[in-house]
Amino acid sequence: MSNVYDKAHELKKAIAESEEFSALKSMHEEIEADEIAKKMLENFRNLQLELQQKQMQGIQITEEEAQKAQQQFELVQQHELISKLMEAEQRLSVIIGDINKIITEPLEEIYGNPEGQQ
């Protein structure tokens, strides 16, 4: 039987060589070269992080904060590079989610599938 760590490294390499990863990396490089896009994305991600931390601490997000986040999201989506980056992130996220489902299937045999998904 092959070593699972070797397989994990093969998977890492396959992800790094995938079209989806290459597209994401390329979009990051383009945004790094565009100061406006870089700053917009940075501000948006900082706001996201701030709100996530509040939620994790059990602090209620105000209506004003929710509106600000929505406005920031709409603003960054209007920027072509950032919008493309988010699409690339989503595509890679789907792949990683699918891979996660596949590699956790053996655990479902032991613990069952609480989500009832296949």
Curated annotation (Swiss-Prot):
A Pfam family annotated for this UniProt entry: Com_YlbF
Signal peptide: none
InterPro entries listed in its UniProt record: Com_YlbF, YheA/YmcA-like_dom_sf
Family: Belongs to the UPF0342 family.
Protein name from the UniProt record: UPF0342 protein BpOF4_11360
Species annotation: Alkalihalophilus pseudofirmus (strain ATCC BAA-2126 / JCM 17055 / OF4)
Top-level taxonomy: Bacteria, Bacillati, Bacillota, Bacilli, Bacillales
